[in-house]
Amino acid sequence: MADQQNVEAITDHSNGSAIASPRSSTDSRSPSTRSQSLRLSHSNHQHRQSFSDSLRAAPGSPRARRQPSLTQAAIQSLIDNPPAPRDVNPAFAGRDWREITIGELVSPDDLKFVEVDTGIEEATNMLIDTNAPVLLIRETPQQKTVVGTFDYSDLNAYLLLAAGLTQPTEELRAPYEQLARKAREGHKIPLQDVKALGRNEPLTTLPASASLMAAVETFGGGVHRVIVVDERKDGEVVGIFSQFRLVKFLWENGRSFPVIDQLYPQYLRDLGIGSREVVSINGDKRLCEVLQLMNSEGISSVAVVDNHANVVGNISTTDVKLLTRSSSLPLLHNSCIHFISVILSARGLVEGKDSFPVFYVNPGSTLAHTVAKLVATKSHRLWVTDPLSPSSSGPPTPSHSSGQLPLAANPIQSPPLSPPPTSAGIPSPNYTTPHLPSPPVGIPHVVAPSIPASALPGARLSGRLVGVVSLTDILNLHARASGLRPADPAENRSRRRRSSSSSVSVRKSGDIGRELFSRRE
């Protein structure tokens, strides 16, 4: 039968069996007929495919036709003039800022007290755990007045002393040895004894009824914080007012203060603010050297640069809280670059911030851009860089250098820099309890591998360091624009430097350091 299926035997060579495979009657046509049919079918398929492809050509990307929402000029304008926060306190809307009192801007919740006989370990724990910028020292828990402060600059000076990196001058040797005797006998080391060996800056107080004008003039002269007291209650402390809080307040409410608001769109180079002298350290230098530098110069932060003076990071006195654990001992002898990686790692683990902090502006930045960045990063100063300078220009940067900031005439001058401290015979202390150094036990200096300063992409990160602009510079500008006559900030800088250098000097031997913290807990 024509319709009957033929069966083709296919031999399975693997097992020798025969498998029947059905084949339709159409397959029984002659080979030439089948070949012609297949060619026609294939030709029709190709025709259909090409026609289909022509109809289904990939459409153009909408992004190619979409116009940018902001022009380059608009983006630059937004960078130069960032919008201030909209959540302005209605209590200050429409008011003359010169009539607002500092008592309205402080809170008793900011006050953290310790007593003169509080132990150094307890005070350090409190400073770190409460995240307070400063502790107020009083005579007794019942007193409402203060006799001193304890902050991270004091903690830095104390750690240098405990690690044997500094020693007192001759006039302070007797109280220093008395402190060492207390340590040997296992007694608590009170704050008043430690403060006697450190920097002794006078307390600056202002009444709560003082206007912001008084605060601007005081801060513009280089004072970093004031103790706010209630003159009606025998000088009872009611708050702490700082440079940062004032700058933040004026920025957030600037639209209500025309005298200040008109300054924000202007460029740093035109305003003539900033310091031509800037302290920096090469990233390959040891961490202990930058701690000594901050202590001897009386400053709270130092720019870290690569071999061509490009800014690659920032180390401040606040970062010393990462050095109060026993596991932190080797960091003192590791490089500054390595410590910056530790800072960023700790910030990511504790605060969930994994971005690289931005601590620089350039002479072409507006005051608004500068202040917005200061407020956003909670910084006290920003490094001024020249982003157009080639990374290969200039010789390798020494550990202590200064740059020239191309600002307008008559910029704020800073005094010449004092020579950097040197050290010899540095002992290796051991920290047996969370925040208290104890006797050295000869731990070797373990240097962790880190990227050398010569290999850092500093030119792409920032630019060549040429100056610094601080909260003091900005408030000094506000004071002068308001018709005030603030003191020269250079005088306060010199006073802090003299206070630091007269209190401690660089160690030449580790003998006293070994005696100071000879007890174990």
Curated annotation (Swiss-Prot):
Residues 1-70, 386-437, 484-521 are annotated as: Disordered. Residues 508-521 have a biased composition (Basic and acidic residues). Residues 413-422 have a biased composition (Pro residues). One of its GO terms (cellular component) is nucleus. CDD domains: CBS_pair_SF (cd02205). GO terms for biological process: cellular response to glucose starvation; regulation of mitotic metaphase/anaphase transition. Keywords: CBS domain, Cytoplasm, Nucleus, Repeat. Residues 106-171, 199-256, 274-331, 335-391 form the CBS domain. SMART domains: CBS. Its main location: cytoplasm. One of its GO terms (molecular function) is protein serine/threonine phosphatase inhibitor activity. It comes from the Eukaryota. Involved in DNA replication and cell separation. This is Protein sds23. The lineage of its organism: Eukaryota, Fungi, Dikarya, Ascomycota, Pezizomycotina.
